[in-house]
Design a protein with these regions (language model features):
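Short linear motifs embedded in intrinsically disordered, charge-biased segments
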Residues: 1-322
Length: 322
């Protein structure tokens, strides 16, 4: 199956593997538009070239009726940001920006309103902010840095809703428990697994299923560190949710069984992640307490005051000279 165009409402995206093939598609598309009395807006039409790994980038030159189209590094299609490099860095920043903007617009009418219960505010947050933040996350291939950025924004919003200040010294695990939310990692992996099961149940002729289970006919992966693939992310999610990667397709064939496996796996993964975070926090606290207990300190010879650092002792000695 060769995919040449992606159509949705009045949006159209053309795909080609070579520059001359793309120019041919654009010429054919422009001719078809003329036959139906349509006009292509060259100011809204952009070109993006994604070279294969190891191949130098060159700016494409695509024209419509003699007018060259603007080449861009990234563009937005159906709400998602597509970049020239195979990374979701810009998409994650875009998601955080849109969710932050939505959170700010609701501050006066929802978050700061005393007449609205906290439970209702959390439902609004889940329906508006969280869906904006994780829009199209089913198709992401996230790295840990992306999940950390999303999780930090998630916790900032929950602390603001629950009126928890940083001076209260309440850990993130307790904030999530009070709000009744899971971590961003669990939410993203849960969405990916649900989407994977939906694709697995599609007929074999459907394009999403062919893309998920297909293999490249040409080319090979470079030597050394490899870029993370969607299949790699999906396999990690299955292992985290205690789902066998070898037999997941049989489980996903039955929708109710697959949903139950995902829900149970999410609870297990969240409990393990919570226990690990609590254990790390206790270890960090114990190391700090033991270091403070065994530290010799710096004693003032004048009054016997103990200072934690030498610079503190020097500053304190100045008070005796005045």
């Amino acid at each position: 199956t060769v995919i040449r165009d992606l159509l949705f409402a009045d949006d159209c995206a053309l795909n080609a593997s070579r520059e001359q093939d793309m120019q041919h598609l654009v010429d054919r598309f422009a001719a078809a538009c003329d036959n139906f009395g349509l006009t292509i807006s060259t100011t809204k039409t952009e070109v993006m070239h994604q070279p294969a790994p190891g191949i130098p980038y060159h700016e494409p030159c695509i024209t419509v009726k003699g007018q060259q189209l603007r080449a861009v590094e990234n563009f937005t299609y159906l709400g998602s940001n597509l970049a020239r490099t195979p990374s979701i860095d810009i998409e994650v920043q875009n998601r955080i920006s849109k969710a932050s903007s939505a959170f700010g617009r609701l501050r006066e009418r929802v978050w700061d309103r005393r007449g609205i219960r906290t439970k209702t505010k959390l439902k609004v947050y889940s329906a508006v902010i969280l869906t904006t933040l994780l829009y199209a996350c089913e198709t992401w291939t996230p790295y840990r840095r992306h999940l950390r950025q999303l999780h930090s924004f998630h916790l900032r919003c929950l602390r603001a809703l629950l009126h928890i200040r940083w001076q209260d010294r309440i850990p993130d695990t307790e904030v999530l428990q009070r709000a009744g939310f899971s971590t961003i990692t669990t939410l993203v992996r849960k969405a990916q697994l649900r989407w994977a099961g939906h694709v697995a149940r599609m007929p074999d002729h459907r394009i999403p299923k062919q893309l998920l289970f297909g293999e490249l006919a040409e080319g090979k992966r470079s030597v050394g560190g490899q870029k993370k693939r969607f299949k790699d992310s999906l396999k990690t999610s299955m292992k985290d949710f205690k789902i066998n990667p070898e037999s997941w397709e049989q489980c996903a064939a039955e929708r109710s069984t697959w949903r139950s496996a995902i829900s149970q796996g999410a609870l297990t993964a969240e409990d393990q992640r919570l226990a690990h975070a609590i254990h790390k926090r206790l270890e960090r606290k114990s190391r700090g307490a033991s270091a403070q207990h065994t530290a010799p300190g710096f004693i003032c010879p004048e009054c016997g005051k103990s200072c934690r650092a030498r610079i503190g002792l020097i500053s304190h000695l100045r008070s005796h000279k005045t």
